[in-house]
Amino acid sequence: MKKTALIFYLLFSFSSFAQETDFFTKLKYTDLIFYQKEYIFDIRIKGENPENYTGNFKISSNDYEATNCILNSSRHSKDIKRAKELLQKMILISNALYRSLYQYVYYDKEHYTASYIAPNCWKLSFADEETRKRMSVSKDAVCYFIVKLDENGYITQIKSVIEEDRDITVDYTTKELSPQEASALGGKITEVLMGNNLVSNFTNIKGSISNPNVKKTFVFEIKTKQ
């Protein structure tokens, strides 16, 4: 009985170790294209002055400008302007979070430690003070990424945490595109994005951003219009 228990323990320990050290080879990164698609959105701000915007829009530029924005429950220009500002912010954050994982973490593996914490889920922490400074994080702040991958190694969730300052979680559902499909969506921008990387278009993004200092939580969902 003891021998069997020992075997299971060793197998589990070896599996955990292998997964922990395998994050950077497990990760299969695809550049995301956000252009030339129509999307449905739902944005809610929870706090003292709650806000709620639902409707559809189109992303039309490299700055993720929301055009053709239509709200389901309001036609006031100030509401449309506010919704467009929030949409741009949500998309910029989602894209920046996604890209930073690759640009900062993947290319500078030695500056991060990866800890396996659950099936296909890793915690990434800064390994040195130099990396903290580059990421504009104070030396006393507790900061880390939680990254979930699917069975094939593609990103499904990124959580960026600076304790007592902010907590951002974004879930990604993506569709890999052929070079022809990517070019049709992104035009010349795909020549920059593609390189040797695969390209995807997101079909659904869900996220939340909380900041205890302002006592507000942003909850949003943006998905491709069928």
Please give the residue ranges for each predicted region.
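Short, exposed beta-strand/loop patches in secreted or surface proteins that constitute
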Residues: 31-33, 56-61, 105-117, 146-148, ...
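Residues that act as N-cap/strand-start positions at coil-to-secondary-structure junctions
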Residues: 51-53, 108, 141, 214
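Sec-dependent N-terminal signal peptides
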Residues: 4-14
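N-terminal leader/targeting segments and the immediate start of mature chains
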Residues: 16-47
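Flexible, processing/modification-adjacent segments and terminal tails
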Residues: 20, 69-143
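Positively charged n-region of N-terminal signal peptides that target proteins for export
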Residues: 1-4, 19
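N-terminal, post-signal-peptide region of Sec/Tat-exported proteins
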Residues: 44-78
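Gly/Pro-enriched, hydrophobic low-complexity segments
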Residues: 122-226
